[in-house]
């Protein structure tokens, strides 16, 4: 599992992401986009790795088990745990990790713009999307002072 006499690996490569080897496994795994604390705990427990050990002190076999669990994560979890419970195009459950998260969000926003949905129009015009008030907050641009009439 963890070797105390071995030097620490400062960067551990998992799912095309460099993870910090000086942090515990639970915290280090959250460096992957799409992996939070709950997901990291599930990955560590499924891989059989102690979650409080430094990531850089794990031996190669443990890191390989973590890589395997991360790559097959969507197959091991219930629907409510995935970050994409029903894909728009295929209708199947997926859990997106890494660059797939940002690409999919961008694709979803572009789809909303294309079909001229209300949310898509708000995205296009740069306005707030989720129903916030816009009269006094979220102002951008030049600051214009108030001019008073001469008495």
UniProtKB/Swiss-Prot annotation:
Signal peptide stretch: none
PROSITE patterns, per database record: RIBOSOMAL_S13_1, RIBOSOMAL_S13_2
Pfam families in alphabetical order: Ribosomal_S13
Record key words, sorted: Ribonucleoprotein, Ribosomal protein, RNA-binding, rRNA-binding
One example of a Gene Ontology biological process annotation: translation
GO molecular-function term, one example from the UniProt record: rRNA binding
Record's GO cellular component terms: cytosol; small ribosomal subunit
Oligomer and partners: Part of the 30S ribosomal subunit. Forms a loose heterodimer with protein S19. Forms two bridges to the 50S subunit in the 70S ribosome.
Family from the record: Belongs to the universal ribosomal protein uS13 family.
Summary of the function given for this chain in its UniProt record: Located at the top of the head of the 30S subunit, it contacts several helices of the 16S rRNA. In the 70S ribosome it contacts the 23S rRNA (bridge B1a) and protein L5 of the 50S subunit (bridge B1b), connecting the 2 subunits; these bridges are implicated in subunit movement.
Name of the protein in its database record: Small ribosomal subunit protein uS13
Lineage: Archaea, Methanobacteriati, Methanobacteriota, Stenosarchaea group, Methanomicrobia
